[in-house]
């Protein structure tokens, strides 16, 4: 969802009503919230989140936080996004109550406003989540529009493609399909493929798109979805829940 003329403080308060990655994932998250920003001072964003995480309020925060760099992202104004993840929907609610009542959250929000401006926000639910994405060092993300009625059939075809390429060695780490629950004015779903680093990621992508399994996948999903953008996402830092 595009943020047009809204107050940065209002937006960032929502970050903590709604929240991982680069933390070790021992359980699955039930939802993730992405807050896309145009960052002018990356070090300032990291510092603001560092201080909040170290505070008494941050120590009680029931979610995982991470900062991702959208290294290559087409024409979008977004340069980074904060990903906030929860193990339960109750954690989502509790985080909102906590951060609206603690002064450390207000301090952090003020610091973030000095280092970034909002671009868009969205909440997602995982449909497919294979392997531990929190340990990966690079991702290719494909944003797309798809009718909900085609989701199950697409998910089956995507899983078949991924499983085939895991066997061939071109997919070596995490992959997934996510549905946008809120903020789907631009895209309704996205898929991602992760790898340990950029070289491994791009080598695998070349092999995948030239495989017979990809040809079969393309035939199966023709007309089901429209790919709108492909982006390179690099993890920057994570602040795991205590």
Predicted segments — roles?
Residues 1-7:
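Short, Lys/Arg-enriched N-terminal segments with co-localized hydrophobic residues
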Residues 10-20:
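Sec-dependent N-terminal signal peptides
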Residues 24-215, 220-242:
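Short S/T/G/P-rich N-terminal loop/turn motif that feeds into the first structured element of a domain
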Residues 7-10, 45:
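Terminal low-complexity, poorly structured segments
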